Amino acid sequence: MAKPLGTTGEFFRRRDEWRKHPMLSNQMRHALPGIGIGVGAFCVYLVGEQIYSKLMAPSSQSSHQKQPAPSH
């Protein structure tokens, strides 16, 4: 048999009732399926693009050496 709640247990049960509200349960998770995976993939893309741009950026020394000769 379960132990009776008392005043403290009743307080915590009433305080946490909002967590079981239907709008906050599975409905929000099912409303946007895959949003977490999409945000994660987009973040990986952004990090990869930053790494790629830093690796492929011309260095300051090489840009001075490869200037075309003036055609007069």
Swiss-Prot record:
It is a single-pass membrane protein. It holds the Pfam family NDUF_B12. The chain crosses the membrane at residues 31-48. It is found in: Mitochondrion inner membrane. One of its GO terms (cellular component) is mitochondrial inner membrane. The keyword Electron transport applies. It comes from the Eukaryota. Keywords: Electron transport, Membrane, Mitochondrion, Mitochondrion inner membrane, Respiratory chain, Transmembrane, Transmembrane helix, Transport. GO terms for biological process: electron transport chain. Belongs to the complex I NDUFB3 subunit family. Accessory subunit of the mitochondrial membrane respiratory chain NADH dehydrogenase (Complex I), that is believed not to be involved in catalysis. Complex I functions in the transfer of electrons from NADH to the respiratory chain. The immediate electron acceptor for the enzyme is believed to be ubiquinone. PANTHER family: NADH DEHYDROGENASE [UBIQUINONE] 1 BETA SUBCOMPLEX SUBUNIT 3 (PTHR15082:SF2), NADH-UBIQUINONE OXIDOREDUCTASE B12 SUBUNIT (PTHR15082). Complex I is composed of at least 49 different subunits. This is NADH dehydrogenase [ubiquinone] 1 beta subcomplex subunit 3-A. It comes from Arabidopsis thaliana (Mouse-ear cress).
